[in-house]
């Protein structure tokens, strides 16, 4: 519905399809051809489909008192949301809200440039990859998802106490701006297709 209503978006999606790699081509018994293409979601495609609310955010420099110039070991470096206990399926633009409905992670906190290049978050089934651990750093905040919400169940609801911890974390603006958020899911779409 979104692509059909905007010729610019439709043209961009068509260009992405033209640039995609052919993965599989087969013919069915009724003489139709089935084609599977593979393309990256990052870059131009995300630039087209991410909502306009995700804007460029200037880099904020958090100033520490002169005596404390080195990074504190207690400083949080990212956010991990465990959504394995709920039926949440990956979406391009997830929103995290508290039980009271306040937005904890949304367009307000995300830099468009970073989201376009790297995605709004990363979805994983296990925290065993070095890249995954590197993405959220050595000291991420970990929270559990309570349930889904919002249109199409594209929002994750977390507890008030977890939301309070995140909101009181000074460095959250830095790691959220950089989209250093991982959502742990029970299955990714690739796992479901197999």
Task: Give the role of each language-model region.
Residues 1-194:
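Domain-level marker for long, solvent-exposed, non-transmembrane regions
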